Protein backbone atom coordinates (compact mmCIF):
# COMPACT_ATOMS: atom_id res chain seq x y z
CA UNK A 1 0.00 0.00 0.00
CA UNK A 2 0.95 3.64 -0.46
CA UNK A 3 0.56 5.65 2.74
CA UNK A 4 0.85 9.45 3.00
CA UNK A 5 1.37 10.94 6.48
CA UNK A 6 0.68 14.68 6.76
CA UNK A 7 1.69 17.20 9.43
CA UNK A 8 -0.26 20.51 9.34
CA UNK A 9 1.39 23.91 9.23
CA UNK A 10 2.06 25.47 12.62
CA UNK A 11 0.30 28.78 13.31
CA UNK A 12 2.70 31.59 14.32
CA UNK A 13 3.79 31.47 17.97
CA UNK A 14 6.84 31.93 20.19
CA UNK A 15 7.79 28.36 19.25
CA UNK A 16 7.90 28.78 15.47
CA UNK A 17 10.63 31.45 15.06
CA UNK A 18 8.97 32.57 11.83
CA UNK A 19 10.69 35.96 11.83
CA UNK A 20 14.15 34.51 11.21
CA UNK A 21 13.71 31.11 9.53
CA UNK A 22 13.93 32.42 5.93
CA UNK A 23 17.15 34.30 6.63
CA UNK A 24 18.55 31.19 8.33
CA UNK A 25 17.80 29.19 5.21
CA UNK A 26 15.35 26.95 7.08
CA UNK A 27 11.62 26.35 6.70
CA UNK A 28 10.83 25.00 10.19
CA UNK A 29 12.51 24.97 13.59
CA UNK A 30 12.14 21.18 13.99
CA UNK A 31 9.89 18.36 12.72
CA UNK A 32 6.93 16.88 14.55
CA UNK A 33 8.16 13.42 15.56
CA UNK A 34 4.74 11.73 15.23
CA UNK A 35 4.89 10.95 11.52
CA UNK A 36 8.49 9.65 11.37
CA UNK A 37 7.54 7.46 14.35
CA UNK A 38 4.43 6.18 12.56
CA UNK A 39 6.49 5.51 9.45
CA UNK A 40 8.89 3.47 11.57
CA UNK A 41 5.95 1.39 12.81
CA UNK A 42 4.87 0.64 9.23
CA UNK A 43 6.02 -2.61 7.66
CA UNK A 44 8.58 -2.52 4.86
CA UNK A 45 6.03 -4.02 2.46
CA UNK A 46 4.28 -0.62 2.38
CA UNK A 47 5.50 2.61 0.77
CA UNK A 48 5.40 5.56 3.19
CA UNK A 49 5.58 9.24 2.22
CA UNK A 50 5.83 12.15 4.65
CA UNK A 51 4.45 15.62 3.99
CA UNK A 52 5.20 18.35 6.52
CA UNK A 53 3.22 21.43 5.52
CA UNK A 54 5.79 23.56 7.37
CA UNK A 55 8.42 22.75 4.74
CA UNK A 56 6.42 21.88 1.61
CA UNK A 57 3.03 22.44 0.02
CA UNK A 58 0.41 19.72 0.38
CA UNK A 59 -0.37 17.88 -2.86
CA UNK A 60 -3.92 16.62 -2.48
CA UNK A 61 -3.63 14.61 -5.69
CA UNK A 62 -0.83 12.31 -4.53
CA UNK A 63 -2.00 8.73 -5.13
CA UNK A 64 -2.31 7.03 -1.75
CA UNK A 65 -4.38 4.22 -0.29
CA UNK A 66 -4.35 5.83 3.16
CA UNK A 67 -3.77 9.45 4.21
CA UNK A 68 -3.00 10.08 7.88
CA UNK A 69 -3.17 13.52 9.51
CA UNK A 70 -1.84 14.40 12.97
CA UNK A 71 -1.84 17.55 15.08
CA UNK A 72 -2.33 19.32 18.39
CA UNK A 73 -5.45 21.23 19.44
CA UNK A 74 -4.04 24.35 17.82
CA UNK A 75 -4.03 22.48 14.48
CA UNK A 76 -7.67 21.42 14.75
CA UNK A 77 -9.13 23.64 12.04
CA UNK A 78 -6.34 22.89 9.58
CA UNK A 79 -6.62 19.16 10.29
CA UNK A 80 -10.29 19.25 9.30
CA UNK A 81 -9.42 21.17 6.12
CA UNK A 82 -6.75 18.63 5.18
CA UNK A 83 -9.02 15.68 5.88
CA UNK A 84 -11.79 17.24 3.79
CA UNK A 85 -9.41 18.00 0.91
CA UNK A 86 -8.16 14.43 0.67
CA UNK A 87 -11.60 12.94 1.24
CA UNK A 88 -13.01 15.00 -1.63
CA UNK A 89 -10.50 13.23 -3.89
CA UNK A 90 -11.61 9.80 -2.73
CA UNK A 91 -8.81 9.10 -0.27
CA UNK A 92 -9.28 7.00 2.86
CA UNK A 93 -8.37 9.41 5.68
CA UNK A 94 -7.35 8.74 9.27
CA UNK A 95 -6.59 11.15 12.14
CA UNK A 96 -4.47 10.82 15.26
CA UNK A 97 -2.24 12.73 17.64
CA UNK A 98 -3.03 14.86 20.71
CA UNK A 99 -6.07 16.60 19.16
CA UNK A 100 -7.68 13.33 18.15
CA UNK A 101 -6.88 11.85 21.56
CA UNK A 102 -8.22 14.75 23.63
CA UNK A 103 -11.11 15.83 21.37
CA UNK A 104 -12.11 12.79 19.26
CA UNK A 105 -15.70 13.98 18.86
CA UNK A 106 -14.44 17.09 17.03
CA UNK A 107 -13.12 14.86 14.24
CA UNK A 108 -15.95 12.36 13.93
CA UNK A 109 -17.45 12.65 10.48
CA UNK A 110 -14.26 14.23 9.16
CA UNK A 111 -12.08 11.09 9.21
CA UNK A 112 -12.80 7.47 8.34
CA UNK A 113 -10.76 6.31 11.33
CA UNK A 114 -9.75 8.10 14.53
CA UNK A 115 -6.83 7.02 16.72
CA UNK A 116 -7.06 7.83 20.41
CA UNK A 117 -3.84 7.52 22.40
CA UNK A 118 -0.42 6.22 21.44
CA UNK A 119 -0.05 4.32 18.16
CA UNK A 120 2.61 1.66 18.81
CA UNK A 121 -0.01 -1.10 19.01
CA UNK A 122 -3.02 0.37 17.22
CA UNK A 123 -1.35 1.52 13.98
CA UNK A 124 0.06 -1.88 12.92
CA UNK A 125 -3.27 -3.49 13.91
CA UNK A 126 -5.19 -1.00 11.79
CA UNK A 127 -2.98 -1.69 8.76
CA UNK A 128 -3.70 -5.42 9.06
CA UNK A 129 -7.43 -4.72 9.46
CA UNK A 130 -7.46 -2.35 6.48
CA UNK A 131 -5.93 -4.95 4.20
CA UNK A 132 -8.65 -7.45 5.14
CA UNK A 133 -11.45 -4.88 4.98
CA UNK A 134 -12.24 -5.23 8.69
CA UNK A 135 -11.09 -1.83 9.95
CA UNK A 136 -12.82 -0.05 12.84
CA UNK A 137 -13.94 3.58 13.07
CA UNK A 138 -11.99 4.09 16.31
CA UNK A 139 -8.73 2.60 17.54
CA UNK A 140 -8.11 3.31 21.19
CA UNK A 141 -4.98 2.46 23.19
CA UNK A 142 -5.94 0.42 26.23
CA UNK A 143 -2.48 -0.10 27.74
CA UNK A 144 0.50 2.25 27.63
CA UNK A 145 2.97 0.82 25.09
CA UNK A 146 6.42 -0.43 25.99
CA UNK A 147 8.77 2.03 24.28
CA UNK A 148 11.69 -0.38 24.49
CA UNK A 149 10.04 -2.28 21.62
CA UNK A 150 9.46 0.81 19.47
CA UNK A 151 11.41 0.84 16.17
CA UNK A 152 13.55 3.77 15.08
CA UNK A 153 11.59 6.65 13.51
CA UNK A 154 12.12 7.12 9.76
CA UNK A 155 14.32 10.20 9.97
CA UNK A 156 15.50 9.39 6.44
CA UNK A 157 12.08 10.43 5.08
CA UNK A 158 12.53 14.00 6.37
CA UNK A 159 13.92 16.83 4.26
CA UNK A 160 16.61 17.40 6.89
CA UNK A 161 18.24 20.59 5.49
CA UNK A 162 14.93 22.43 5.84
CA UNK A 163 14.91 22.01 9.64
CA UNK A 164 17.01 23.87 12.18
CA UNK A 165 17.15 20.78 14.43
CA UNK A 166 15.97 17.18 14.46
CA UNK A 167 13.88 15.57 17.19
CA UNK A 168 14.06 12.31 19.10
CA UNK A 169 12.19 10.94 22.10
CA UNK A 170 13.54 9.10 25.13
CA UNK A 171 10.51 8.78 27.42
CA UNK A 172 6.80 9.56 27.77
CA UNK A 173 4.89 10.42 30.92
CA UNK A 174 5.57 12.63 33.94
CA UNK A 175 5.35 11.84 37.67
CA UNK A 176 3.90 15.24 38.62
CA UNK A 177 0.25 16.33 38.78
CA UNK A 178 0.16 19.90 37.44
CA UNK A 179 -3.53 20.79 37.22
CA UNK A 180 -3.43 22.41 33.77
CA UNK A 181 -1.25 19.81 32.03
CA UNK A 182 -2.59 17.35 29.47
CA UNK A 183 0.62 15.28 29.34
CA UNK A 184 -0.35 13.01 32.23
CA UNK A 185 -3.83 12.68 30.70
CA UNK A 186 -2.37 11.34 27.45
CA UNK A 187 0.78 9.54 28.63
CA UNK A 188 0.27 8.80 32.31
CA UNK A 189 2.26 9.53 35.46
CA UNK A 190 4.62 6.58 35.17
CA UNK A 191 7.46 7.51 32.80
CA UNK A 192 8.17 4.87 30.16
CA UNK A 193 11.50 5.00 28.37
CA UNK A 194 13.37 3.55 25.44
CA UNK A 195 16.54 1.61 26.06
CA UNK A 196 19.73 3.68 26.05
CA UNK A 197 21.05 1.80 23.02
CA UNK A 198 17.84 2.66 21.10
CA UNK A 199 18.29 6.36 21.75
CA UNK A 200 21.98 6.29 20.91
CA UNK A 201 21.18 4.65 17.57
CA UNK A 202 18.75 7.51 16.86
CA UNK A 203 21.38 10.08 17.84
CA UNK A 204 23.90 8.50 15.47
CA UNK A 205 21.31 8.49 12.68
CA UNK A 206 20.53 12.19 13.19
CA UNK A 207 24.24 12.94 13.06
CA UNK A 208 24.64 10.84 9.90
CA UNK A 209 21.84 12.79 8.24
CA UNK A 210 23.63 16.09 8.89
CA UNK A 211 21.94 17.49 11.99
CA UNK A 212 23.90 19.81 14.27
CA UNK A 213 21.20 20.10 16.94
CA UNK A 214 18.89 17.49 18.46
CA UNK A 215 15.86 18.34 20.56
CA UNK A 216 14.82 15.50 22.87
CA UNK A 217 11.08 16.14 22.97
CA UNK A 218 10.26 14.44 26.29
CA UNK A 219 7.86 16.58 28.31
CA UNK A 220 10.01 15.81 31.33
CA UNK A 221 13.33 14.21 30.43
CA UNK A 222 14.11 13.54 34.11
CA UNK A 223 10.80 11.88 34.99
CA UNK A 224 12.86 8.76 35.68
CA UNK A 225 16.18 10.12 36.95
CA UNK A 226 18.00 6.80 37.04
CA UNK A 227 17.34 6.13 33.37
CA UNK A 228 17.99 9.76 32.43
CA UNK A 229 21.42 9.63 34.06
CA UNK A 230 22.25 6.42 32.18
CA UNK A 231 21.43 8.08 28.88
CA UNK A 232 23.33 11.26 29.75
CA UNK A 233 26.45 9.22 30.52
CA UNK A 234 26.17 7.50 27.14
CA UNK A 235 25.66 10.84 25.36
CA UNK A 236 28.67 12.32 27.16
CA UNK A 237 30.87 9.37 26.16
CA UNK A 238 29.70 9.58 22.54
CA UNK A 239 30.21 13.33 22.41
CA UNK A 240 33.69 13.07 23.86
CA UNK A 241 34.65 10.40 21.31
CA UNK A 242 33.26 12.42 18.39
CA UNK A 243 34.34 15.99 19.31
CA UNK A 244 30.80 16.95 20.39
CA UNK A 245 29.18 17.27 16.95
CA UNK A 246 25.66 17.82 18.33
CA UNK A 247 24.04 20.35 20.65
CA UNK A 248 21.25 18.83 22.73
CA UNK A 249 18.12 20.52 24.09
CA UNK A 250 15.23 19.11 26.10
CA UNK A 251 12.50 19.85 28.66
CA UNK A 252 12.85 19.15 32.38
CA UNK A 253 11.21 20.02 35.69
CA UNK A 254 12.79 22.61 37.97
CA UNK A 255 13.79 20.01 40.56
CA UNK A 256 16.77 19.36 38.27
CA UNK A 257 18.39 22.19 40.23
CA UNK A 258 18.42 20.05 43.38
CA UNK A 259 20.57 17.31 41.81
CA UNK A 260 24.19 18.33 41.26
CA UNK A 261 25.12 15.02 39.63
CA UNK A 262 22.31 15.42 37.12
CA UNK A 263 23.40 18.97 36.26
CA UNK A 264 26.99 17.84 35.81
CA UNK A 265 25.82 15.09 33.45
CA UNK A 266 23.78 17.55 31.38
CA UNK A 267 26.91 19.67 31.12
CA UNK A 268 29.08 16.70 30.17
CA UNK A 269 26.60 15.58 27.48
CA UNK A 270 26.64 19.08 25.91
CA UNK A 271 23.07 20.17 26.61
CA UNK A 272 23.12 23.87 25.78
CA UNK A 273 19.46 24.70 26.49
CA UNK A 274 16.72 23.20 28.62
CA UNK A 275 13.12 24.33 28.78
CA UNK A 276 11.60 24.48 32.27
CA UNK A 277 7.97 25.11 33.11
CA UNK A 278 8.46 27.64 35.90
CA UNK A 279 4.96 29.08 35.35
CA UNK A 280 4.86 31.75 38.07
CA UNK A 281 7.04 33.55 40.62
CA UNK A 282 4.05 33.55 42.99
CA UNK A 283 4.10 30.59 45.38
CA UNK A 284 0.34 30.67 45.94
CA UNK A 285 -0.24 30.23 42.21
CA UNK A 286 2.21 27.33 42.05
CA UNK A 287 0.53 25.56 44.95
CA UNK A 288 -2.89 26.20 43.44
CA UNK A 289 -1.90 24.44 40.21
CA UNK A 290 -0.12 21.61 42.10
CA UNK A 291 3.29 22.67 40.81
CA UNK A 292 4.77 21.71 44.17
CA UNK A 293 8.18 20.83 42.72
CA UNK A 294 8.69 24.54 41.96
CA UNK A 295 8.15 25.64 45.56
CA UNK A 296 11.30 23.99 46.93
CA UNK A 297 13.99 26.58 47.50
CA UNK A 298 14.34 29.99 45.92
CA UNK A 299 13.20 30.14 42.29
CA UNK A 300 15.89 32.53 41.11
CA UNK A 301 18.62 30.61 42.91
CA UNK A 302 17.41 27.36 41.31
CA UNK A 303 17.49 28.89 37.83
CA UNK A 304 20.97 30.30 38.38
CA UNK A 305 22.21 26.93 39.61
CA UNK A 306 21.25 25.44 36.25
CA UNK A 307 22.84 28.34 34.38
CA UNK A 308 26.07 27.91 36.33
CA UNK A 309 26.55 24.59 34.49
CA UNK A 310 26.68 26.36 31.14
CA UNK A 311 23.02 25.73 30.32
CA UNK A 312 20.51 28.29 29.08
CA UNK A 313 17.14 28.05 30.80
CA UNK A 314 14.18 28.78 28.56
CA UNK A 315 11.14 29.40 30.74
CA UNK A 316 7.51 28.52 30.33
CA UNK A 317 5.49 31.17 32.20
CA UNK A 318 1.73 31.55 32.68
CA UNK A 319 -0.54 34.36 33.83
CA UNK A 320 -4.18 33.95 34.79
CA UNK A 321 -4.04 31.61 37.78
CA UNK A 322 -6.72 32.06 40.44
CA UNK A 323 -4.17 33.64 42.79
CA UNK A 324 -2.99 36.09 40.13
CA UNK A 325 -4.18 39.68 40.41
CA UNK A 326 -3.34 42.84 38.48
CA UNK A 327 0.12 42.98 40.12
CA UNK A 328 1.27 39.68 38.61
CA UNK A 329 2.41 41.20 35.30
CA UNK A 330 5.09 43.42 36.81
CA UNK A 331 6.00 40.57 39.15
CA UNK A 332 6.53 38.23 36.20
CA UNK A 333 8.67 40.76 34.34
CA UNK A 334 10.78 41.47 37.41
CA UNK A 335 11.37 37.75 37.99
CA UNK A 336 12.38 36.99 34.40
CA UNK A 337 14.79 39.93 34.38
CA UNK A 338 16.38 39.03 37.72
CA UNK A 339 16.63 35.33 36.83
CA UNK A 340 18.58 36.22 33.65
CA UNK A 341 16.22 34.24 31.41
CA UNK A 342 16.67 35.56 27.85
CA UNK A 343 13.83 33.53 26.33
CA UNK A 344 10.50 33.22 28.11
CA UNK A 345 7.49 31.61 26.44
CA UNK A 346 4.88 33.53 28.41
CA UNK A 347 1.24 32.66 27.84
CA UNK A 348 -2.28 32.77 29.25
CA UNK A 349 -3.70 29.98 31.38
CA UNK A 350 -5.87 27.61 29.35
CA UNK A 351 -8.13 24.80 30.45
CA UNK A 352 -7.35 21.97 28.03
CA UNK A 353 -9.90 19.17 27.56
CA UNK A 354 -9.82 16.27 30.06
CA UNK A 355 -7.37 18.02 32.42
CA UNK A 356 -8.19 18.49 36.13
CA UNK A 357 -8.23 22.26 35.55
CA UNK A 358 -10.84 21.88 32.82
CA UNK A 359 -13.09 19.77 35.03
CA UNK A 360 -12.74 22.21 37.94
CA UNK A 361 -13.49 25.45 36.09
CA UNK A 362 -16.31 23.74 34.20
CA UNK A 363 -17.89 22.70 37.52
CA UNK A 364 -17.40 26.24 38.87
CA UNK A 365 -19.09 27.79 35.84
CA UNK A 366 -15.92 29.67 34.83
CA UNK A 367 -15.19 27.95 31.50
CA UNK A 368 -15.70 30.72 28.95
CA UNK A 369 -15.13 28.58 25.84
CA UNK A 370 -13.42 25.45 24.62
CA UNK A 371 -9.67 25.73 24.14
CA UNK A 372 -8.35 26.64 20.72
CA UNK A 373 -4.88 25.53 21.78
CA UNK A 374 -3.21 28.94 21.36
CA UNK A 375 -2.20 30.00 24.85
CA UNK A 376 -0.58 33.17 23.54
CA UNK A 377 -3.87 34.74 22.40
CA UNK A 378 -6.69 33.18 24.39
CA UNK A 379 -7.60 32.26 27.93
CA UNK A 380 -10.83 30.31 28.13
CA UNK A 381 -11.18 30.82 31.90
CA UNK A 382 -12.92 33.57 33.84
CA UNK A 383 -10.21 34.77 36.29
CA UNK A 384 -10.86 34.95 40.03
CA UNK A 385 -9.01 38.12 41.08
CA UNK A 386 -9.28 40.30 38.00
CA UNK A 387 -11.54 40.75 35.02
CA UNK A 388 -10.77 39.19 31.66
CA UNK A 389 -10.17 42.71 30.37
CA UNK A 390 -7.55 43.32 33.08
CA UNK A 391 -5.95 39.97 32.24
CA UNK A 392 -5.67 40.73 28.53
CA UNK A 393 -4.47 44.29 29.05
CA UNK A 394 -1.85 43.18 31.55
CA UNK A 395 -0.70 40.30 29.38
CA UNK A 396 -0.37 42.55 26.34
CA UNK A 397 1.83 44.92 28.36
CA UNK A 398 3.91 42.03 29.70
CA UNK A 399 4.81 40.41 26.37
CA UNK A 400 5.65 43.82 24.95
CA UNK A 401 7.97 44.59 27.85
CA UNK A 402 9.63 41.16 27.71
CA UNK A 403 10.89 41.67 24.17
CA UNK A 404 11.49 45.40 24.41
CA UNK A 405 15.04 46.07 23.18
CA UNK A 406 16.32 47.34 26.53
CA UNK A 407 14.80 44.60 28.70
CA UNK A 408 15.88 41.73 26.43
CA UNK A 409 19.40 43.15 26.02
CA UNK A 410 19.83 43.61 29.76
CA UNK A 411 18.87 40.08 30.82
CA UNK A 412 20.68 38.49 27.87
CA UNK A 413 23.92 40.26 28.76
CA UNK A 414 23.43 39.34 32.42
CA UNK A 415 23.06 35.70 31.40
CA UNK A 416 25.97 35.60 28.96
CA UNK A 417 28.39 37.26 31.37
CA UNK A 418 27.40 35.04 34.31
CA UNK A 419 26.75 31.69 32.63
CA UNK A 420 29.04 28.78 33.44
CA UNK A 421 31.38 27.42 30.79
CA UNK A 422 30.29 24.73 28.34
CA UNK A 423 32.02 21.44 27.70
CA UNK A 424 32.60 22.26 24.03
CA UNK A 425 32.86 26.04 24.07
CA UNK A 426 29.26 26.80 23.15
CA UNK A 427 26.81 25.99 20.41
CA UNK A 428 27.73 24.19 17.21
CA UNK A 429 27.75 26.29 14.05
CA UNK A 430 27.88 24.58 10.66
CA UNK A 431 30.43 25.87 8.18
CA UNK A 432 27.71 27.20 5.92
CA UNK A 433 26.06 28.96 8.86
CA UNK A 434 29.04 31.23 9.55
CA UNK A 435 28.60 33.18 6.34
CA UNK A 436 24.83 33.13 6.71
CA UNK A 437 25.03 34.59 10.22
CA UNK A 438 27.34 37.28 8.95
CA UNK A 439 24.90 38.20 6.19
CA UNK A 440 22.03 38.30 8.67
CA UNK A 441 23.93 40.65 10.95
CA UNK A 442 24.84 42.87 8.01
CA UNK A 443 21.21 42.95 6.88
CA UNK A 444 20.08 43.68 10.44
CA UNK A 445 22.40 46.64 10.77
CA UNK A 446 21.45 48.06 7.36
CA UNK A 447 17.71 47.42 7.33
CA UNK A 448 16.65 46.91 10.93
CA UNK A 449 16.49 50.59 11.79
CA UNK A 450 18.52 52.59 14.31
CA UNK A 451 17.08 50.94 17.43
CA UNK A 452 17.92 47.44 16.22
CA UNK A 453 21.35 48.54 15.09
CA UNK A 454 22.03 50.03 18.54
CA UNK A 455 20.68 46.90 20.24
CA UNK A 456 22.78 44.55 18.11
CA UNK A 457 26.03 46.51 18.22
CA UNK A 458 25.82 47.14 21.96
CA UNK A 459 24.99 43.49 22.74
CA UNK A 460 27.85 42.19 20.62
CA UNK A 461 30.28 44.94 21.61
CA UNK A 462 29.87 44.51 25.35
CA UNK A 463 30.08 40.72 24.98
CA UNK A 464 33.26 40.98 22.88
CA UNK A 465 34.89 43.26 25.44
CA UNK A 466 33.86 41.44 28.60
CA UNK A 467 33.55 37.77 27.56
CA UNK A 468 34.58 37.13 23.95
CA UNK A 469 34.29 33.35 24.38
CA UNK A 470 30.47 33.61 24.25
CA UNK A 471 30.30 35.99 21.28
CA UNK A 472 28.71 33.42 18.97
CA UNK A 473 25.92 32.92 21.53
CA UNK A 474 25.46 36.69 21.63
CA UNK A 475 25.09 36.70 17.84
CA UNK A 476 22.47 33.96 18.15
CA UNK A 477 20.51 35.86 20.80
CA UNK A 478 20.59 39.03 18.69
CA UNK A 479 19.15 37.15 15.72
CA UNK A 480 16.55 35.28 17.79
CA UNK A 481 15.28 38.59 19.15
CA UNK A 482 14.10 39.48 15.67
CA UNK A 483 11.73 36.52 15.72
CA UNK A 484 10.31 37.27 19.17
CA UNK A 485 10.03 41.01 18.58
CA UNK A 486 8.24 40.43 15.28
CA UNK A 487 5.88 37.91 16.85
CA UNK A 488 5.01 40.10 19.83
CA UNK A 489 4.12 42.95 17.47
CA UNK A 490 1.74 40.63 15.62
CA UNK A 491 0.44 39.27 18.92
CA UNK A 492 -0.23 42.81 20.15
CA UNK A 493 -2.55 43.37 17.21
CA UNK A 494 -4.54 40.24 17.94
CA UNK A 495 -4.71 41.05 21.64
CA UNK A 496 -5.90 44.57 20.81
CA UNK A 497 -8.78 43.00 18.87
CA UNK A 498 -9.66 40.78 21.84
CA UNK A 499 -9.40 43.76 24.21
CA UNK A 500 -11.70 45.81 21.99
CA UNK A 501 -14.29 43.03 22.06
CA UNK A 502 -14.14 42.84 25.85
CA UNK A 503 -14.42 46.63 26.10
CA UNK A 504 -17.54 46.54 23.93
CA UNK A 505 -19.08 43.79 26.05
CA UNK A 506 -18.74 45.84 29.23
CA UNK A 507 -19.43 49.32 27.86
CA UNK A 508 -22.79 51.09 28.13
CA UNK A 509 -24.31 51.95 24.73
CA UNK A 510 -22.79 55.04 23.12
CA UNK A 511 -19.65 55.16 25.31
CA UNK A 512 -16.34 55.19 23.43
CA UNK A 513 -13.48 52.91 24.48
CA UNK A 514 -9.95 53.85 25.43
CA UNK A 515 -6.72 51.91 25.06
CA UNK A 516 -4.96 51.69 28.40
CA UNK A 517 -2.07 49.42 27.42
CA UNK A 518 1.34 50.65 26.37
CA UNK A 519 2.24 49.61 22.85
CA UNK A 520 4.94 47.27 21.63
CA UNK A 521 7.82 49.34 20.27
CA UNK A 522 8.84 49.13 16.65
Q: Across the structure, where does each feature detected by a protein language model lie?
A:
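Radical SAM enzyme core and accessory elements
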Residues: 2-5, 12, 47-50, 110, ...
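Flexible glycine/acidic-rich beta-alpha junction loops that bind and position SAM and/or redox cofactors
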Residues: 10-15, 105-106, 225-226, 284-289, ...
Amino acid sequence: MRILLVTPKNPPSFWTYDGILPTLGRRCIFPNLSMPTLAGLTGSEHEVMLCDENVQDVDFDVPADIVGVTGYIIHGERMRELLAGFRARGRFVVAGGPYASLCPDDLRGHADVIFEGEAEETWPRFLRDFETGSWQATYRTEDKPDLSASPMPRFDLLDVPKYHALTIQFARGCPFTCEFCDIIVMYGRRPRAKRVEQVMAEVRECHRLGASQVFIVDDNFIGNRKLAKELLRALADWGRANQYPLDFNTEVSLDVAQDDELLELFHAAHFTTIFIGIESPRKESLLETRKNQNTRGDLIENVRRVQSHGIQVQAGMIVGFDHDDALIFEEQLRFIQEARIPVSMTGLLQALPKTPLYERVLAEGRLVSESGGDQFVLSNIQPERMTRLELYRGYRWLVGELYDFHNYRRRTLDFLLARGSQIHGGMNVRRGDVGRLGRILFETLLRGGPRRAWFTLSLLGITALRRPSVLKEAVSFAIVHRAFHSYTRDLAGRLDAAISELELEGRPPGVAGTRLCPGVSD
